[in-house]
Each structure stands twice: as C-alpha cells, then as structure tokens.
C-alpha cells in the first residue's frame, strides 16, 4: 500500500490525536475529537473536509463528530462517508448503504458499504483532508478497520491527508490473542494479517498498516 501522510498531535507518533494519556489517577481520558476541538480545529481550518464516521463518533457529552465539525468555526465539512450501518447507524448489519443526503446537515453521504467499499476518485474530488472517527473494538472482524485501510489507500493515491481521531481500545493494549488469517481466506472481516485481538487503538493501527504497507493483496 502506498504510504499516506497522517497528521499528528504528538511529535513522537504518526497519527492524529491519540487519547490523552492519564498522568494521574482519575485523570480524564479525552477522545481525539475533544483534543482537536481544544486546538481550535487548527489542522482543518481553511480546508475542505470529508468525514468517515458513525454514531460511535461522539465527544464525552455524546455530541456527534458530524455536528461538531459541521458547526466548527473555519472548518468546511463538505462530505460524509458511510461505512457499514451508515453514518447515522440506521442500516442493519450487512445491509447495503446507499449514497444519500444527511438530513441533519444536508451534506452528501457517499456509501463505503454498497457498490464499492473503497472511495472512488469521484468521491474524493471535493476534499482536501479526510477525517476518520469511529470507536474500534479491538478485533479483526470489525469491518470499520477494513474501511479505514481502504480509505487510506484511496487517499494516498490522490495525495489527500488523513486525520485519525483516536479513541481507547476497550480490550486494552496488553491483550493479543488468536491466529493470523490463512492465505486464501482474506475478506472484508479479515483484511489484514494480524491476530484476531490485536491490542492497538485505531490510530495505532492506522500507523501500523501505513508503515508496514499491509494490504491483503500484498500479504503472502
């Protein structure tokens, strides 16, 4: 997979806004969207923004990342991209997500779980940066990490920056279990050669596949 430029908050890592590490007992853990908001949305100001998200993309007060970015000063949110279940979570598991218009914002919604699962050049032509904000669960069969990988591929091909708004892995970072996918069995629920429980946040996972070039076509 062609490498992509992933914007950073920490100078030490190549991903945007991993959750803030709690330095003292009881310190609040902040999801990436809150870190971005505290920075004044600086890396998005003046850019045309696309957003891959679903109902799990919220702040600690359950405000949707869609609504936060849509109303953010200086940010021009121009398109939404719907993974499995859609951006508002109104499609059943495995159901086809269609291109539509978001009722709350009037923004176009491009389906990433219908006729195609990888954004087409046409879907990306009006954006300067792609933001990804979905809560991961830490297991390989979660289709959203496959969507993330395909979004990264498509954006790399078009020279579009990707911002991953990170969130904690609910299974933690110390538990890694399960076998790798065997050759011939890669699919949208097993797209990468990683253990079933892989012990990374979605931001760390994005960095990992970016640096390792892991896409299912290149794995032997």
Please provide the spans of the model-predicted regions.
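Short internal beta-strands
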Residues: 76-85
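Glycine-rich, charge-decorated loop segments at or immediately adjacent to ligand/cofactor-binding or catalytic sites
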Residues: 89-93, 163-186
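Glycine-rich oxoanion-binding loops at beta->alpha junctions
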Residues: 97-127, 139
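Glycine/threonine-rich flexible loop motifs
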Residues: 136-148
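Acidic, His- and aromatic-enriched active-site or binding-groove loops in soluble protein domains
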Residues: 182-202
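Conserved small/polar residues in nucleotide/adenosyl-binding loops
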Residues: 219-220
